[in-house]
């Protein structure tokens, strides 16, 4: 870990460079064009659809 104490500034420069490149690429992104051309999402499929019709509660009008 001695090398980390000696060369911490190089690691810091690399991290700052990666952050700046990320910001630069995000600025190039045209979000308006993406929103105009985005694909339609398929309808949401409920995984519990087969159980939705079943009545979980007992009938209150049943005579005991």
From Swiss-Prot:
Pfam families: UPF0370
Biased composition (Basic and acidic residues): 36-47
Disordered: annotated segments: 36-64
Presence of the UniProt keyword Transmembrane in the record: yes
Matching InterPro entries: UPF0370 (IPR020910)
Residue stretches spanning the membrane: 3-23
Keywords for this protein: Cell membrane, Membrane, Transmembrane, Transmembrane helix
GO CC, any one term: plasma membrane
Membrane topology: Single-pass membrane protein
Entry keyword annotation includes Transmembrane helix: yes
Top-level division of the source organism's lineage: Bacteria
Signal peptide feature range: none
Location of the protein in the cell: Cell membrane
Sequence similarity: Belongs to the UPF0370 family.
Name by which UniProt lists this protein: UPF0370 protein YPO3055/y1425/YP_2677
Source organism per UniProt: Yersinia pestis
């Amino acid at each position: 870990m001695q090398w980390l104490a000696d060369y911490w500034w190089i690691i810091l420069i690399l991290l700052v460079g990666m952050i700046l490149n990320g910001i630069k690429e995000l600025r190039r992104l045209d979000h308006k064009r993406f929103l105009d051309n985005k694909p339609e999402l398929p309808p949401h499929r409920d995984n519990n659809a087969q159980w939705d019709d079943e009545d979980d509660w007992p009938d209150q009008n049943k005579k005991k």
